Amino acid sequence: MKGSKRGRWILILALLPVISMAQTRHEMSLQQAIDYARKNNVQVKNALLDVQIQQQTNREVTGSAYPQISANGSMTYNAKLPVSLVPAEFFGGTPGTFEELAFGVKWNATGGVTLNQLLFDGQVFTGLQARKTLIEFQQKNVEITEETIRANIYKVYYQLVVSKTQLDLIDANLDRLEKLKKDTRIMYDNGFAEKLDIDKLDVQLVNLNTEKTNAVNQIGNGYLGLKVLMGMPISDEVVLTDTLSNEMIRDGVLDASQFDYAQRRDFQYINMGVRLREYDVQRYKMSKIPTLSLSAYYNKNAQRNEFDFFKSGGSWFDISAITLNLNIPIFTGFAANARISKARLSMQQSINQREALKLQIDNEVQVARNNYTTAVSNLDYQKKNMGLAELVYEQTKKKFEVGTGSQTEINTAQTDLKSAQTNYINALYNAIIAKVDFLKATGKL
């Protein structure tokens, strides 16, 4: 028995780190959620890695302009020396005959250092000029990725805030119906209401509770989606601290009304793409001009009939040379011209894409502005309408309580109130989404 208890305690202690980790709680404003995502979202992480990859690629290009130094060494054992036929008369022999002579030694060793230095290569120098733009190109991609994640977090975060408001309205309606049911039962007990009136209220209560259950489930799923966007463990708990008001929906939009293409990160990105295409054209043009390089080597060579290279006193012979290499392209079968033309066509494609993006941006800004204006107007109307529906419901309820109103009237007022609340919730969500889309379209998000 003691062993069983000890085993349970061991299991509990083993699970404590897991339980603790599962109960991590994060209270987050919208900005804190965005900052968390910038550090933990996988897409942002990979975009940042692309910047580092480009930095290493730039180092590789830079390295080609530095001296290239290498050491080499070899050792050869000549198992069979080559034999040459030499006229015998060279050695006092019979004219017209030949002697077989083996030339060489059994062992050869060579060691040395080689240096190559690029002095001028237009293609390499163009690559060096493009390094900064290439880094900025990848950094701009990081900004675009962050902006996309930021926009999605805006929408999901405020969707959850709006859903909380929706849940509060459902709870308020449940309280109203419970009180109305209680009052109706009292009236029924006193003979002023029918059992059917109570049954109708029970149906409405069941429907509202079902709606609440669905809303709670949707909110839970929304939190899961927010965690995925932020790169947060699913087991962690998130508590949203920001609220939503009409003033927040209007705040910052006036500044966004002043718009410039250069404020859009995707427009900046495609501009950099055009510049990189220009570097391509320049690089291929440079392939038609001469290249100049310097090479040098210094070697030591030794020859032995016995393997005694490491003994002192043996002779080693120095070999050294310096070479200036000039390569002048004369004819490449029109391949260079074809590469230049292809690069120019690709650059024109990028320019065309930039012009197409301008049209797309114009459309996005105008549509987003129209949607925002309409959404804010609808929000104002629906807020007033919800207040009016609440007033109508309260007045109808009072009439019902004093016996001058019917159950049909109060059911209608309840239905109208619920419809007005639903319309307000939808208008509130549509307004904040329209604001996010407008800020993103104008490059102000």
Regions found by a protein language model. Name each.
Residues M1-K2, Q56, E146-Y261, N371, ...:
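Periplasmic alpha-helical coiled-coil/stalk elements that build and connect Gram-negative outer-membrane
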Residues M1-Q31, N41, I425, A431, ...:
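Bacterial Sec-dependent N-terminal signal peptides
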Residues A22-S74, K80, I234, L240-E278, ...:
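Bacterial Sec-pathway N-terminal export signals of envelope proteins
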Residues T24-R25, N72-V113, T243-D251, S295-I328:
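Small/polar, glycine/serine/threonine/aspartate-rich low-complexity segments that form flexible
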Residues A33, N40, A47, Q117, ...:
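Amphipathic alpha-helical coiled-coil segments and their boundaries
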Residues K45-L49, T62, L119-E146, L196, ...:
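Sec/SRP-type N-terminal targeting helices
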Residues T210-M232, G387-K444:
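Short segments within alpha-helical structural elements
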